[in-house]
């Protein structure tokens, strides 16, 4: 008798719940870890209340000791704490795949760099792509990139997690995939601002396109490949996050563009818009590597320095012309 694979999902927010549903479609036994667990037979969770969890998903408040793979689906800012505790109980051979997007605010570290400190020697990877949680949870067609420094591991994990509705592509550019996933949240805020402020579709298209070049420069400076920006984790995620109203970061930008104060926007939300915290950390990372990131810098100044939208417009458009 063949033993069914065991997949552990750490974090039961919207994306964690969606990934539990998606991976359950592989036929594996899925464990979904919650910080404050509900009764084990509960089939609906607060972040996606219209979704019924498959029967092969088990909810728990205990970290797994063994699994074929662990998906870490916590916010970036809590990944250090959770992964440190997970490391003490999890078999050292079990790979951990981070599914969060952003930079640790205090250190400007990408998620896998955090795991390198908290889980030294462990095989790790990153999963990222143009995915709204509710659509993945419903089983609608979607795709993403799973990247590991070891391509063979990435291929093994994509074979384990791939389904007929959630298609995964293997990559060995973990640095580029992470960087793209983090930066797109910042760019999405800028894209939302352009529409909310009535600057037009042309402005949004220009911002997204120039952001690809900007993120590509930063990816290369941090050990990634600019070519990764042409894939699902780059352009795919940018298009979705910068145009879809289901994007938390884009919707923050929309409200900012309409004139609502940032503090009021954040106070009214129960979910995290990672781009708000990632923006200053991303700018610090770019300055560390001497990379020009005018869009990221302008969004950061809008969020943190009181720069007006009109001033931001001139900061971007009044720069000397350059070649593309």
Swiss-Prot record:
Sn-glycerol 3-phosphate binds at residues 101, 129, 184, 237, 247-249. Its EC number is 1.1.1.94. It catalyses: sn-glycerol 3-phosphate + NAD(+) = dihydroxyacetone phosphate + NADH + H(+); sn-glycerol 3-phosphate + NADP(+) = dihydroxyacetone phosphate + NADPH + H(+). Pfam families: NAD_Gly3P_dh_C, NAD_Gly3P_dh_N. InterPro entries: 6-PGluconate_DH-like_C_sf, 6PGD_dom2, G3P_DH_NAD-dep, G3P_DH_NAD-dep_C, G3P_DH_NAD-dep_N, NAD(P)-bd_dom_sf. Its main location: cytoplasm. It is found in: Cytoplasm. This is Glycerol-3-phosphate dehydrogenase [NAD(P)+]. The lineage of its organism: Bacteria, Pseudomonadati, Pseudomonadota, Alphaproteobacteria, Acetobacterales.
């Amino acid at each position: 008798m063949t033993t069914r694979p065991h997949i552990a999902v750490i974090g039961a927010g919207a994306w964690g719940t969606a990934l539990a549903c998606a991976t359950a479609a592989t036929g594996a036994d899925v464990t979904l870890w919650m910080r404050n667990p509900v009764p084990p037979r509960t089939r609906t969770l607060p972040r996606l209340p219209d979704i019924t969890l498959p029967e092969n998903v088990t909810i728990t408040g205990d970290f797994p000791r063994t699994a074929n793979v662990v998906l870490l689906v916590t916010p970036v800012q809590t990944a250090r704490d959770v992964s440190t505790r997970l490391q003490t109980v999890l078999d050292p051979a079990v790979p951990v795949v981070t599914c969060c997007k952003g930079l640790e605010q205090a250190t400007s570290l990408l998620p896998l760099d955090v795991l390198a400190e908290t889980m030294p020697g462990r095989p790790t990877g990153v999963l990222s792509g143009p995915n709204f949680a509710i659509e993945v949870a419903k089983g609608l067609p979607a795709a993403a990139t799973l990247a590991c420094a070891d391509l063979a591991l990435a291929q093994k994990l994509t074979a384990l997690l791939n389904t007929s509705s959630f298609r995964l592509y293997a990559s060995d550019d973990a640095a580029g995939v992470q960087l793209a996933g983090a930066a797109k949240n910042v760019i999405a805020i800028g894209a939302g601002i352009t529409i909310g402020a009535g600057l037009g579709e042309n402005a949004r298209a220009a911002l997204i396109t120039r952001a690809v070049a900007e993120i590509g420069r930063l990816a290369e400076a941090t050990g990634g490949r600019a070519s990764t920006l042409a894939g699902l984790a780059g352009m795919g995620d940018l298009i979705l996050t910068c145009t879809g109203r289901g994007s938390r970061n884009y919707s923050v930008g929309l409200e900012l563009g309409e004139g609502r104060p940032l503090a009021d926007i954040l106070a009214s939300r129960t979910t995290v818009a990672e781009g708000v915290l990632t923006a200053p950390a991303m700018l610090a990372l770019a300055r560390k590597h001497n990379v020009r990131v005018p869009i990221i810098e302008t969004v950061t100044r809008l969020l943190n320095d009181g720069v007006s939208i009109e001033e931001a417009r001139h900061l971007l458009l009044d720069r000397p012309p350059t070649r593309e």
